């Protein structure tokens, strides 16, 4: 398995946490799919090895409770992170980055969000590099506060940014999101995923084309953006 992991390092250089990507986006590139293994692709085996709590992990650190993810287009994941006590969500993107999606992660869940995205490619042309020309331009890595206010922005070029997080003041006022689940539970109970979990348990695709074929064989519906 080729894993997509987010790694949290402490100031001493030691690994604090490793969070495995929960799921890959499907149906983005006609004729091609990602063949890296996310939790959803091996779900039953993952639960057997690590337990349900590890599906959406939150690392407790001395600077705050931190969750990490490279997942896009699924705000339910970040709401669940907030339910589990996340105070800082670190998100990453390699193109296809929606600035407002990142800002609204903070706005809807009343927490801090960090996003690291591709900057401008100033070197030789890389055929696999996403320039984000259709998404408002490259870069724009940023830090957002609990009400979705931008605290720092890197712009288009590779840049270091920082912002102070008054974690104790934040905790004094912070509450988990207020969700009226009773209204929505009947709808969620009727929903069927586009494809079932565990698609990569028995056989791993060896290429993007094989992953695409496997997706078509298992998908209940197919659409492309």
Enumerate the language-model features and the residues they cover.
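Active-site catalytic loop in hydrolytic enzyme cores
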Residues: 1-87, 100-104
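Alpha-helix boundary/capping residues
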Residues: 22, 93, 177-180
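Sequence-level detector for tyrosine residue identity
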Residues: 35, 40-46, 50, 99, ...
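CN hydrolase (nitrilase-like) catalytic-core segments centered on the catalytic cysteine
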Residues: 64-67, 71-164
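C-terminal beta-strand edge segments of enzyme domains
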Residues: 118-225
């Amino acid at each position: 398995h080729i894993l997509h992991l987010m790694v949290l390092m402490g100031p001493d250089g030691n690994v604090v946490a490793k969070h495995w990507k929960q799921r890959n986006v499907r149906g983005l590139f006609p004729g091609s799919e990602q063949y890296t293994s996310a939790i959803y692709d091996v779900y039953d085996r993952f639960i057997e090895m690590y337990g349900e709590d590890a599906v959406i992990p939150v690392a407790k650190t001395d600077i705050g409770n931190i969750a990490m993810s490279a997942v896009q287009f699924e705000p339910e994941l970040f709401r669940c992170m907030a339910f589990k006590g996340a105070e800082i969500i670190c998100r990453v993107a390699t193109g296809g980055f929606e600035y407002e999606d990142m800002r609204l992660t903070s706005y809807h869940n009343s927490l801090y969000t960090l996003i690291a995205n591709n900057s401008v490619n100033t070197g030789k042309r890389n055929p696999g590099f996403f320039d984000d020309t259709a998404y408002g331009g490259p870069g724009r890595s940023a830090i957002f506060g609990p009400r979705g206010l931008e605290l720092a922005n890197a712009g288009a070029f590779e840049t270091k940014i920082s912002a102070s997080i008054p974690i104790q003041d934040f905790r004094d006022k912070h509450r988990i999101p207020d969700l009226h689940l009773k209204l929505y539970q009947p709808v969620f109970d009727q929903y069927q995923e586009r494809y079932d979990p565990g698609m990569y348990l028995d056989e791993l695709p060896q290429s993007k084309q094989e992953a695409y074929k496997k997706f078509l064989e298992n998908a209940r519906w197919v659409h492309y953006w």
